Amino acid sequence: MWPVFWTVVRTYAPYVTFPVAFVVGAVGYHLEWFIRGKDPQPVEEEKSISERREDRKLDELLGKDHTQVVSLKDKLEFAPKAVLNRNRPEKN
């Protein structure tokens, strides 16, 4: 009797396995839901770093007066002296 049973189970394994797996999965899902309880309240998503940076830059722009800019005539050198005169001791 057992050899016939195992032959039938082996032959029809896909047809037997799927319903058994489906029932076990459904029972496990509902059991886990029952043990865990109600769904937790959704947590507010934290802003990403790029969003926080954009907000900070917008706040900085709002606080500035864009009509007051430094004249190019006031800027005598565009590069710092330390970079250009590093190897020239007579200029230091």
UniProtKB/Swiss-Prot annotation:
<dbReference type="InterPro" id="IPR031933">
    <property type="entry name" value="UPF0767"/>
</dbReference>
<dbReference type="GO" id="GO:0016020">
    <property type="term" value="C:membrane"/>
</dbReference>
<feature type="transmembrane region" description="Helical">
    <location>
        <begin position="15"/>
        <end position="34"/>
    </location>
</feature>
<keyword id="KW-0472">Membrane</keyword>
<dbReference type="GO" id="GO:0005739">
    <property type="term" value="C:mitochondrion"/>
</dbReference>
<comment type="similarity">
    <text>Belongs to the SMIM12 family.</text>
</comment>
<dbReference type="Pfam" id="PF15990">
    <property type="entry name" value="UPF0767"/>
</dbReference>
<protein>
    <recommendedName>
        <fullName>Small integral membrane protein 12</fullName>
    </recommendedName>
</protein>
<keyword id="KW-1133">Transmembrane helix</keyword>
<keyword id="KW-0812">Transmembrane</keyword>
